[in-house]
Regions:
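Conserved SF1/SF2 helicase motif Ia
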Residues: 45-66, 161-163
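Post-DEXD/H (motif II) to motif III coupling segment of the RecA-like Helicase ATP-binding lobe
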Residues: 137-197
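Conserved interdomain linker/interface between the two RecA-like ATPase lobes of SF2 helicase motors
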Residues: 178-183, 188-260
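Conserved RecA-like helicase motor core of SF1/SF2 enzymes
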Residues: 489-493, 497-501, 517, 523-574
Length: 933
């Protein structure tokens, strides 16, 4: 390690390593790039030196490959490290089982291979000294519940071979890490949470894409999509030599963003080849149309300008290839300047002194000082100052990419002269921004409707504005050579699960080396992969949790340099709420990680797997939790296990591990096959097939577009053919729900809040076609697919008829009001529970058969529940208050995707009553809820 420049340990690294050396189970939860790897690597390598073995678990293959690369660079002959995952050639697996003493794998392989074949790994398990669970915050929801049971099975197998390994868990972002770690492993845990590592600053920008002139369902305004903005930004940043990761919510979206960004750079390459006159500066995408204003210094300043598929990502009204100037974004530009005031907004100005700006974009601020401006786009400055923000919507001709490219240039040029003044948020690292103490530093964070007060810097000398007209805004830095124009498009690629292993490793290497400057990726690269030298991260859509947001933002700046992270809002209630309420992000702790190992739908399959590995005994039951005995009895009654005097035995010839789909897809796999060639393109789980490869669906695979000719669920195949439709598709379903039992209830205003077990019946009934270039709906085609039944858990609230009668008398549509409130509530729940809106569903009705009252349900989309609805029950007042605020603060008249419309509504977003939903929620929230009974 000394040969690699490691001369000592930071205090938090030493503390965690020391606990592990003493045999204490420990979780280290510190900031991104804080050196957690060294904290567990030190005792792990020592274990190998002493003749022991180490098992390293990670959620992703990419992280395991990255860790293996780092281990091999140490050149320690006593450490025989190897990856054992689905990409490992079969001819290498025997050697790994017999000789490797540091095995890097994932929960899937542990579940399906290592534990069922534990006798083949007996030497490894007998000497197992340490289990490293890296990026453990990724183990949440149903997936986390499965992993918790897999770890319990691992402990049981180790006990069979006489070993009691020490567990070290690592996470950059975890709330109550010790509590979570105990729930995940079933073991008592020490925790290390004090981060003593040095950090560069990260500028966080919140961006709401502009409205277009188009109209969607019900005449609602259409906003430019987050993926379209991300593609433009990615192209612009790559053109500026800014190494960038763009996180996209879906595989299809990642492919589309990469294709679009490459197309834009192709246009730029053509323009450069045709018009280059010897200058070493690149033309900025769209700058030829930028307006300019003057900052307070008199310098000319540019004028104001998320693994599942989401409809917003894929139905894109402004992706390639629109007829416009070469790679033009045609949205103007924005100003980024440093000063003693901080203003982030759609005003065109920011300068030294406190500043005044109004508008929208990254954020809008008002205050007093030397400069003021109005406009659209983004403006950011750093320094000290206070203010309050206003909110309005940007126009379609604003330029996001110019804003952020100029902002990234500002970060670069200001770092040397004024390093302490560089940050829209004053926290020293992302963990501080996410921590509860950050509220003392942040008066209001950078985002629409906010300005930031950088505490402790009020007495600093005023730095010069960074919008120097001599600086190459949006182009290469002075002195850089012109890139080969023909190679520009090759600087961008896509990265996602489903690629061949060698292709993924080549992409990771190319990004590290700088051969690739921009990568559009799913969350496959969110965790831990060390890609030093990244300058910027684009996040297209709220990634689901604050933990994921800070984790993705932390991918940039890992080498200690300053960095830029941009959250681009999708057109849905949650994203819109966040960019208009940045206090929901900054100064807030990360969410509690929700998992439920006792879920019988999770526990049952793992008890079967455990019995198949080693027959279960009474002594094993405490390992699997308090409900294990009841679940075992049920498994015996189903004939899956047989009770004998000496324990429970697996009775089937099939593999018991096949009962548990730990990634939560469920059902059999549907093979996607090209009809003309028989080529296997990929596979999707059966529930997802109803919405992604139904007959008539548009299917994307590695940059190719296909049309689904026929979906045969019985045969398990979807036949597709190459096509180039000018539309995208997304499915719509209808849902019915019945109450099995209410576990808990308490009054909420004049109504009642419940949590309990329900049965949900869903059926995909049609799919929408949306024109790619314009975003307009061009068809709603019927489908004939079978219904699917799900027994799960839900939170629901009811209001009696005499309470809602006055609303009906005022002319509000009660069904439409409940429907609108349901949509918005689904959209906002991920802010309070560790979930995605696609992990949950909802049903609303003016009169439900089981309650006899107006009822709104929100349910977990996983069999047996995943803890999301229960979290909503616990936070109901906060959740529904935020829901009401999100609807009321939206500027539309009758409802739009930013507030009450849902892309997955099987009723075509009809009826919806926006004003009625506000009044309905006001009625429900008229008095605080009482304690739970």
């Amino acid at each position: 390690m000394a040969n690699r420049g490691v001369t000592g340990l930071w205090p938090h690294q030493y503390e965690a390593a020391d606990l592990a050396f003493r045999g204490r189970n420990v979780i280290i939860s510190t900031g991104t790039a804080s050196g957690k790897s060294l904290a567990y690597l030190t005792p792990a390598v020592a274990a190998c030196f002493d003749g022991g073995t180490v098992l390293y678990l990670t959620p992703t293959k990419a992280l395991a490959a990255d860790q293996l690369r780092g281990l091999r660079e140490l050149r320690i002959t006593q450490v025989r490290a190897a990856c054992f995952d689905g990409d490992t050639p079969f001819e290498e697996r025997t050697w790994i089982r017999q000789h490797a003493n540091y095995v890097l794998t994932n929960p899937d392989m542990l579940h399906r291979s290592l534990l069922p074949r534990h006798s083949q790994w007996s030497s490894f398990f007998r000497r197992l000294r340490m289990v490293v669970v890296d990026e453990c915050h990724g183990y949440r929801g149903v997936f986390g519940s499965h992993v918790a049971q897999i770890l319990r099975r691992l402990r049981r197998v180790c006990s069979r071979y006489g070993s009691r390994p020490t567990f070290i868990l690592a996470s950059a972002t975890a709330s109550e890490p010790g509590v979570f770690a105990k729930r995940l492993t079933g073991l008592e845990m020490d925790e290390v949470t004090t981060d003593s590592s040095p950090k560069g600053s990260t500028t966080i920008a919140l961006w709401e894409p502009p409205l277009t002139e188009l109209r969607g369902e019900g005449g609602a305004p259409v906003r430019r999509t987050a993926t379209a903005e991300a593609a433009d930004l990615l192209a612009d940043l790559v053109l500026a030599n800014v190494r960038t990761l763009a996180f996209i919510r879906s595989r299809r979206g990642a492919e589309t963003v990469a294709m679009s960004a490459r197309a834009k750079l192709q246009d730029v390459a053509f323009s450069l080849s045709a018009h280059h006159t010897g200058s070493h500066r690149h033309p900025h995408i769209g700058h030829s149309h930028a307006r300019h204003t003057t900052s307070s210094h008199g310098h000319p300043a540019p004028a104001a300008p998320t693994e599942r598929t989401t409809a917003q990502d894929d139905a894109d009204p402004s992706m390639p290839h629109e007829p416009r100037p070469p790679a033009s974004l045609n949205r103007g530009s924005a100003d980024a300047s440093t000063g003693t005031g901080v203003s982030a907004g759609t005003g065109a100005s920011a300068g030294t002194g406190a500043s005044t700006g109004t508008g929208t974009g990254v954020s809008a601020g008002t205050g007093t000082g030397a400069s003021g401006g109005t406009g659209t786009g983004a403006s950011a400055s750093t320094g000290t100052g206070t203010g309050t923000g206003g909110v309005s919507k940007p126009k379609a001709d604003t330029d996001l990419s110019a804003a952020v490219t100029d902002l990234s240039a500002a970060v670069t040029r200001s770092a040397a002269a004024h390093p302490s003044s560089l940050s829209l948020t004053p926290a020293e690292n992302l963990r501080d921004m996410a921590g509860p103490h950050a509220a003392t530093d942040i008066d209001a964070a950078a985002g629409p409707g906010a300005t930031a007060d950088l505490s402790g810097m009020a007495d600093q000398a005023t730095p010069a504005a960074v919008t120097d007209p001599a600086a190459p805004i949006g182009g290469l830095r002075d002195g850089a050579e012109l890139q080969d124009a023909a190679e520009l498009p090759d600087k961008i690629a896509a990265y996602r699960a489903g690629y061949l292993a060698e292709d993924r490793r080549l992409l990771e290497k190319a990004l590290r080396s700088g051969t690739i400057m921009g990568l559009a990726t799913t969350n496959a690269l969110e965790l831990g992969v060390d890609v030093s030298g990244l300058d910027a991260v684009l996040i297209a859509g709220w990634p689901g949790t604050r933990a994921s947001l800070w984790q993705q933002a932390g991918r940039a700046g890992r080498a200690g340099q300053d960095a830029l992270a941009v959250l681009i809002a999708r057109d849905d209630p949650l994203d819109t709420y966040i960019v208009h309420h940045p206090d929901a992000l900054f100064g807030q702790p990360v969410e509690a990680i929700v998992l439920d190992p006792d879920n019988p739908y999770v526990l049952g399959p793992h008890l079967c797997a455990a019995a198949a590995e080693i027959p279960l005994t009474e002594d094993d039951l405490p390992t699997f939790g308090d409900t294990a005995a009841d679940v075992l009895a049920d498994l015996v009654s189903q004939g899956l296990l047989r009770r004998r005097p000496n324990g429970w035995f697996w009775t089937k010839r099939e593999r018991a591990t096949d009962l548990a789909d730990i990634r939560g897809g469920g059902g059999t796999l549907i093979q996607v096959v090209e009809s003309s060639t028989g080529r296997l393109l990929g596979s999707v789980d059966e529930p997802s097939a109803h919405t992604t490869v139904h007959t008539g669906a548009v299917y994307l695979h590695q940059g190719e577009t296909f049309l689904v000719e026929h979906l045969d669920l019985d045969a398990g195949v979807a036949l597709v053919s190459g096509a180039a439709p000018d539309y995208s598709t997304f499915a719509r379903d209808i849902t019915d729900i019945s109450i099995i039992s209410a576990h808990r209830s308490h009054p909420l205003g004049p109504g009642t809040l419940h949590f309990g077990e329900v049965e949900v019946t869903r059926q995909v009934v049609s799919y929408l076609k949306r024109r790619i270039q314009s975003g307009e709906m061009v068809g709603d085609e019927p489908l004939d697919l079978p219904p699917r039944t799900l027994r799960t858990r839900a939170v629901w609230w009811t209001l009696p008829a005499d309470v809602v009668a006055p609303l009906a008398e005022q002319g509000f549509d009660l069904g439409g009001s409940a429907h609108a409130a349901e949509h918005a509530a689904i959209g906002l729940l991920p802010l309070f529970a560790t979930c995605d809106r696609w992990d949950i569903g909802g049903v609303s009705t003016e009169l439900h058969a089981d309650t006899g009252q107006l009822t709104v349900f929100v349910y977990d989309g996983h069999a047996g529940g995943a803890g999301f609805a229960e979290r909503g029950y616990a936070r109901a007042t906060d959740w529904l208050t935020a829901t009401r605020e999100a609807i009321a603060s939206c500027e539309c008249d009758r409802g739009c995707p930013s507030c009450i419309q849902s892309p997955k509504c099987g009723n075509g977003n009809d009826p919806l009553d926006k004003r009625g939903a506000i009044h309905l929620l006001d009625t429900l929230l008229t008095s605080p809820s009482t304690s739970t009974t």
